[in-house]
Regions:
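Glycine-rich phosphate-binding loops of nucleotide-dependent enzymes
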Residues: 2-277, 333-336
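ABC-family P-loop ATPase nucleotide-binding domain
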Residues: 1-17, 259-336
């Protein structure tokens, strides 16, 4: 008899709630990511996805709930979360523009080096050994993402897609067990998106669990073992890609449904009911409108005499006031 062991959870978020004054951005969200798993997090703009990421990584202190990594509840401090084994990227690129590609990756190694300030100043044998090991590890990561040949280039000179890759390499430099990617393909063309998809699979093959936010549905459904959908800060549904993309609630969250009393909502309900019954709804009657009353034409005034009136000098004077010398002045002011 063979026994199968359940996958061990790397991340356990329980009842995570985040309030900003009277606004609840995340409400009672539970999410688990297992070892060697890729989990997708989707939802419309403003659903609370990045806020949830910030709660996981210690940038925000959750109002309620807890976050545990490999069974240990994490303190809400970013450097301690990184040291524990969770790394992340951000929606917007946050590279050090005036540092080289290699130096950017070395920045991500600081949580894995034991050398302190005085060691760096004195540059003793221990420091030099640790520095050489960090450079070797950084170069290995650049080789992994295909940027080893650009190690000495300034990061600002890299194409957009390569800057995104460099951010991932910097996050991996901290040797995480869980990698959080916030919209890693934003702004990419289809070729770059496909390359990123292959990179994430390669990261998973290294034993690193991945939790990824993305709006590219084809990318996220091809990539993920499970997908969770957030709507207005709450987890709406969670399951496999096939289950989530076919869920009517998810479709409604993205495309919208007419609310009660909305223009056209009643007509749409009638059409849907008729389609369900297999009949065609009768067209709505157009209310008759009363013809507007035509005012009677006023009879033209008949002059008292048949002789046509002649214009006097007063009739030909321009409109306006007259000064003491008889010259005309405009209502707007005297003409120059």
């Amino acid at each position: 008899m063979t026994t199968t062991t359940a996958p061990s959870p790397v991340l356990e978020a329980t009842g995570v709630t985040m309030r900003f004054g009277g606004l609840t951005a995340v409400r009672n969200v539970d999410l688990t990511v297992n070892a060697g798993e890729i989990v997708g997090l989707i939802g419309p703009n403003g659903a609370g996805k990045t806020t949830f990421f910030n709660c996981l990584t210690g940038l925000y202190v959750p109002t309620e709930g807890k976050v545990a990594y490999k069974g240990t509840v994490l303190p809400p401090k970013p450097h301690l979360v990184t040291s524990a084994g969770i790394a992340r990227t951000f929606q917007n690129i946050r590279l050090f523009a005036n540092m080289t590609v290699l130096e950017n990756v070395l920045v991500g190694r600081h949580t894995r080096t034991k050398e302190g300030l005085w060691s760096a100043i004195l540059r003793g044998p221990g420091f030099r050994k640790a520095e050489a090991a960090s450079r070797e590890r950084a170069m290995e990561l650049l080789e992994f993402i295909g940027l080893a040949h650009k190690a000495d280039h300034l990061s600002r000179n890299l194409p957009y897609g390569e800057q995104r890759k460099l951010e991932i390499a910097r996050a991996m430099a901290s040797e995480p067990g869980l990698l959080l990617l916030d919209e890693p393909t934003a702004g990419m063309n289809p070729q770059e998106t496909r390359a990123t998809e292959e990179l994430v699979f390669a990261i998973r093959d290294r034993g690193i669990a991945v939790l990824v936010i993305e709006h590219d549905m084809r990318f996220i459904f091809n990539l993920s073992d499970r997908v969770a959908c957030l709507v207005q800060g709450e987890k709406l549904v969670e399951g496999t890609s096939d289950v989530v993309q076919g869920d009517e609630r998810v479709i409604a969250a993205y495309l919208g449904t007419p609310f009660e009393g909305a223009p056209g909502a009643e007509e749409l309900a009638e059409v849907e009911a008729a389609e369900a019954a297999g009949t065609t709804p009768a067209p709505a009657a157009t209310p008759a409108t009363a013809a507007p009353e035509t005012p009677a034409a006023a009879a033209p005034e008949t002059p008292a005499t048949d002789t046509p009136a002649t214009h006097t000098a007063e009739d030909t004077q321009p409109t306006g006031d007259t000064d003491a010398h008889g010259s005309s002045t405009s209502k707007e002011g005297n003409a120059p």
